[in-house]
From Swiss-Prot:
Record's protein name: Glutamyl-tRNA reductase
Pathway: Porphyrin-containing compound metabolism; protoporphyrin-IX biosynthesis; 5-aminolevulinate from L-glutamyl-tRNA(Glu): step 1/2; Porphyrin-containing compound metabolism; chlorophyll biosynthesis
Purpose: Catalyzes the NADPH-dependent reduction of glutamyl-tRNA(Glu) to glutamate 1-semialdehyde (GSA).
PROSITE patterns membership: GLUTR (PS00747)
Domain notes: Possesses an unusual extended V-shaped dimeric structure with each monomer consisting of three distinct domains arranged along a curved 'spinal' alpha-helix. The N-terminal catalytic domain specifically recognizes the glutamate moiety of the substrate. The second domain is the NADPH-binding domain, and the third C-terminal domain is responsible for dimerization.
Keywords: Chlorophyll biosynthesis, NADP, Oxidoreductase, Porphyrin biosynthesis
Residues the record marks as active site: C50 (nucleophile)
Record organism: Parasynechococcus marenigrum (strain WH8102)
CDD domains: NAD_bind_Glutamyl_tRNA_reduct (cd05213)
Source superkingdom: Bacteria
One GO-annotated biological process of the protein: protoporphyrinogen IX biosynthetic process
Annotated catalysed reactions: (S)-4-amino-5-oxopentanoate + tRNA(Glu) + NADP(+) = L-glutamyl-tRNA(Glu) + NADPH + H(+)
InterPro entries assigned to the protein according to its UniProt record, in alphabetical order: 4pyrrol_synth_GluRdtase, 4pyrrol_synth_GluRdtase_dimer, 4pyrrol_synth_GluRdtase_N, GluRdtase_CS, GluRdtase_dimer_dom_sf, GluRdtase_N_sf, NAD(P)-bd_dom_sf, Shikm_DH/Glu-tRNA_Rdtase
Amino acid sequence: MHIAVVGLSHRTAPVEIRERLSIPEQTMETSLQSLRGHEQVLEASILSTCNRLEIYTLVRHPDLGVSAVSEFLSGHSGLATGELTPHLFNYHHEDAVDHLMRVAAGLDSLVLGEGQILSQVKKMMRLGQEHKSLGPILNRLLTQAVSTGKRVRSETNLGTGAVSISSAAVELAQLKLGQSRGLDQLVTLESEQIAVVGAGRMSRLLLQHLQAKGASGVVLLNRTVQRAELLAADFPDLPVQCRPLTDLDQCLSTCSLVFTSTAADDPIIDAARLEPLNRRSKLRLIDIGVPRNIAADAAAVDGVESHDVDDLQEVVARNQEARQAMAREAEQLLQQEAQQFLEWWDSLEAVPTINRLRSSMETIRVEELQKALSRMGPDFSARERKVVEALSKGIINKILHTPVTSLRAPQGRQERQQALRTVERLFSLGDD
């Protein structure tokens, strides 16, 4: 058995490719079932975010398993394998474990050290458990990854400061506004008329950062106004006007800055929608949805400046050096967590031998116990029989404790295999 991950991210694929591979939660069960239906895939889990799509698997054969996942991604996206492959990465075993630890810690994120990715890894594990696509190996790996992410944020400086895709989007708006005034710096958003489209987790983070950066008010649009109102209620100090999505055209006519973050499968803003507005002032659109909420042709409309998640690199580069120094603090911790999982994985090699050893000892125990009890005669009470049986079990457990602990202990693969062969020879443990 082998652990493998196949995926793509902001590092390997542009947003127009990533959006075609995005797997929303409502189709996650079907996708996991499809993967598990392949004879090569024993366990599977999917991480799908705006910046990455990664599929973690336990497979029978690494190359055949990776091919199975690649074929699934090709079918899901509608992209030919030859078109998709240049954007994919794959890692096996130790490299796959190391990669997941880095992802959970935020070290592989566009915004280095971002906190939201840990919640997304937790969600990946929860969905895998709910849809029964996880087994003991990936369940243990994901549990270790979540532990790693928590430790990095609590034990290193990388956990300081709120960083996320949403915070970078707000900073991008500040930067572009400053540049329009001839300034290479972030400026306040106090005078901007701002709209946020969508009322999910990303929109919540947008409202938090807009409030922190001086926004004087926000129009919050959503298909369901009630959901927008529930979100707005959590921001009593920020004037939020909740409106239905049918008011989007009006907001595009009056607002100067619009953020989009919806789960729509297709763009909700495009050139055809913007051109009739005949705006006289600049409209800045910032889209952090994947799939994209704003069509690529929107940027061609006069007076419109459109950005997507790939444009956040400009903001990220401004403070990346400082966060890189913080990230180095986390490297040793990541190595410890990865090694802990790999030692557990290696110890599984001893399980069949340990089980055969226990079975052999249990057979001997039962046979000898029956001989002893038959000699005791009918006067031997049921209580006394239980005491003797407990005694026999205790003796066996004491005898087995040291060899079993030794077989499970961290050690090199060659040393473990030699120890297994020694135990099997000494106790005559055959595969039968």
